[in-house]
């Protein structure tokens, strides 16, 4: 295309075109050169934009664990070295309480809880979730004799699960993850193997869940009472009303720091920092915002996948951690403090007849804390940052070239329309004799030829022959 334009310009500027042809050639060249430069600029800009796709690989361990459900991008507050919102509970204790609105209290068959903490206490209550008054369902994360454990009841008996191998009251930062599905439960501290708990009377829950779909709603309570008599394990945590953080109300106040609490998609500490209307703070509680960098841990950053043997549909949030071999102690390396990925999927309401209050579906997110202090994140992980400006440079260059061409074309048309119409040169030396005579002031007298002479002249003219 550029060669064709150059040929056109050359033809316009050829000698045969005269002065107007030379001007046209110059205008054509003025039009072609900016177009070429603009096109090259657009291509270069587009190439630089295409090169803006960065894939940041965080090198470390070559092990990679697949996650069975979709991963959502972590909140901005949890990227770049933050472990989530942190509160310090001083001497004397304090308490952060979240209350669900009366018409929005969820009933769940599965629960997910994750939190980071550091303390030197041997006895304390970290988090407790209670149902509405009179129901008696609860879930409690506590420290007993320096060991972390969870105790819950969803309508049958108290079920307890504890990590007895990990010492967590050493003043170092630890992360605990708890999952519940019906009466089954898993517990993991840092990178230690996942502890599982399957209570008695919970083996036929899959067939029971299928059968309950065909039981009329009015008979649901009767069936549940009959199942209780048969020793069946109930599965629904009914009408959750409050989340209590700090344990002051239970008489075992927590002293230390708590970071990044996530419960079924709720980021309670973040909400407390934002002065949420449903949260009340009492006692000696102070917002820090991040975990102190002086605290370290010897736990590895390898995520664990919790193994759930039950096949009951999980209707709340889902926690995915990578699988670890049972009986194999965790590899201990002196690395900086880390917290593990907390994966939360969208939630749905249970359709079990045991539900008391209807719940509404909620959506979760991914809490992806990284290492504190701005150091390298988890080994083997990769973050892909895609920029949407891959074609912006090309488009801008083309638009600029087109606009410049239009301006030059309009200028050329303007110059062409306003050109001179032409001038005529008159040779004064070749005037008629009559004009010369008149210019000298002499008057030429016209002679009146006689009729006879004119007749003879006409006769002679008839006899003449003309050759062309």
Swiss-Prot record:
Extracellular compartment segments: 47-391
Residues holding Ca(2+): 137, 154, 236, 238
Gene3D superfamilies in the cross-refs: 2.60.120.200
Record keyword Glycoprotein present: yes
Modification note: N-glycosylated. O-glycosylated; contains heparan sulfate. Heparan sulfate attachment is required for synapse development by mediating interactions with neuroligins.
SMART domains (UniProt xref): 4.1m, LamG
Pfam families in the cross-refs: Laminin_G_2, Syndecan
Domain Laminin G-like: residue ranges: 87-285
Region (Disordered): 350-381, 435-468
Region of interest called Essential for interaction with CBLN1, as start-end residue ranges on this chain: 201-230
Superkingdom field: Eukaryota
Topology Cytoplasmic: residue spans: 415-468
Entry's Gene Ontology molecular function annotations: acetylcholine receptor binding; calcium channel regulator activity; calcium ion binding; calcium-dependent protein binding; cell adhesion molecule binding; neuroligin family protein binding; protein-containing complex binding; signaling receptor binding
One Gene Ontology cellular component annotation held by this UniProt entry: slit diaphragm
Keyword annotations of the record: Angiogenesis, Calcium, Cell adhesion, Cell membrane, Cell projection, Glycoprotein, Heparan sulfate, Membrane, Metal-binding, Phosphoprotein, Proteoglycan, Repeat, Signal, Synapse, Transmembrane, Transmembrane helix
Membrane-spanning intervals of the chain: 392-414
Role, per record: Neuronal cell surface protein involved in cell recognition and cell adhesion by forming intracellular junctions through binding to neuroligins. Plays a role in formation of synaptic junctions. Functions as part of a trans-synaptic complex by binding to cerebellins and postsynaptic GRID1. This interaction helps regulate the activity of NMDA and AMPA receptors at hippocampal synapses without affecting synapse formation. NRXN1B-CBLN2-GRID1 complex transduce presynaptic signals into postsynaptic NMDAR response.
Originating gene: Nrxn1
Location relative to the cell: Presynaptic cell membrane
Subunit (UniProt): The cytoplasmic C-terminal region binds to CASK. Binds NLGN1, NLGN2 and NLGN3, DAG1 (alpha-dystroglycan) and alpha-latrotoxin. Binding to neuroligins is calcium-dependent, and the binding preference ranks as follow: NLGN1 > NLGN4 >> NLGN3 > NLGN2. Interacts with CBLN2 and more weakly with CBLN4. Interacts with CBLN1; interaction is CBLN1 hexamer form-dependent; CBLN1-binding is calcium-independent; isoform 1b does not interact with CBLN1. Interacts with CLSTN3.
Record protein name field: Neurexin-1-beta
Residues in the signal sequence: 1-46
Known glycosylation sites: 184, 346
Alphabetized InterPro entries for the sequence: ConA-like_dom_sf (IPR013320), Laminin_G (IPR001791), Neurexin-like (IPR003585), Neurexin-related_CASP (IPR050372), Syndecan/Neurexin_dom (IPR027789)
């Amino acid at each position: 295309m550029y060669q064709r334009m150059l040929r056109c310009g050359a033809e316009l500027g050829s000698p045969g075109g005269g002065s107007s042809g030379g001007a046209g050639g110059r205008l054509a060249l003025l039009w072609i050169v900016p177009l070429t430069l603009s096109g090259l600029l657009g291509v270069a800009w587009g190439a630089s934009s295409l090169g803006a796709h960065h894939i940041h690989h965080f090198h470390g361990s070559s092990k990679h664990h697949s996650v069975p459900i979709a991963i959502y991008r972590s909140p901005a507050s949890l990227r770049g070295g933050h472990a989530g919102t942190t509160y310090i509970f001083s001497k004397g204790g304090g308490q952060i309480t979240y209350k669900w609105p009366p018409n929005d209290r969820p009933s769940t068959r599965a629960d997910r809880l994750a939190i980071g903490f550091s303390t030197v206490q041997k006895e304390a209550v970290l988090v407790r979730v209670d149902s509405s008054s009179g129901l008696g369902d609860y879930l409690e994360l506590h420290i007993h004799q320096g060991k972390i454990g969870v105790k819950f009841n969803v309508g049958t008996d108290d079920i307890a699960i504890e990590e007895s191998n990990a010492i967590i009251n050493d003043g170092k930062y630890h992360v605990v993850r708890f999952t519940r599905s019906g009466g089954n439960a898993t517990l993991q501290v840092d990178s230690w193997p996942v502890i599982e708990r399957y209570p008695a009377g919970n083996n036929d829950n899959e067939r029971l869940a299928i059968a309950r779909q065909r039981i009329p709603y009015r008979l649901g309570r009767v069936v549940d009472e009959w199942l209780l008599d048969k020793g069946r394990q109930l599965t629904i945590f009914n009408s959750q009303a409050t989340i209590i953080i700090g344990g002051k109300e239970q008489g075992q106040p927590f002293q230390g720091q708590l970071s990044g609490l996530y419960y079924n998609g709720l980021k309670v500490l973040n909400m407390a920092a934002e002065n949420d209307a449903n949260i009340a703070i009492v006692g000696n509680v102070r917002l820090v915002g991040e975990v102190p960098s002086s605290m370290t841990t010897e736990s590895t950053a390898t995520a664990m996948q919790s193994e759930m043997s039950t096949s009951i549909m999980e209707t709340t949030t889902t926690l995915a951690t990578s699988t670890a071999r049972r009986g194999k102690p965790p590899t201990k390396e002196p690395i900086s403090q880390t917290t593990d990925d907390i994966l939360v999927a969208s939630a749905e309401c249970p359709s079990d007849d045991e539900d008391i209050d209807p719940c509404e579906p909620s959506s979760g997110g991914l809490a992806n804390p990284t290492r504190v202090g701005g150091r390298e994140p988890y080994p083997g992980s990769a973050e892909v940052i895609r920029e949407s400006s891959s074609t912006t440079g090309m488009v801008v260059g083309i638009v600029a070239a087109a606009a410049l061409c239009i301006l030059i074309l309009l200028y050329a048309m303007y110059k062409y329309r306003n050109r001179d119409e032409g001038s005529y040169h008159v040779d004064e030396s070749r005037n008629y004799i009559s004009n010369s005579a008149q210019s000298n002031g002499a008057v030429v007298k016209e002679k009146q030829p006689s009729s006879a002479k004119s007749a003879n002249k006409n006769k002679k003219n008839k006899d003449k022959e003309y050759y062309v």
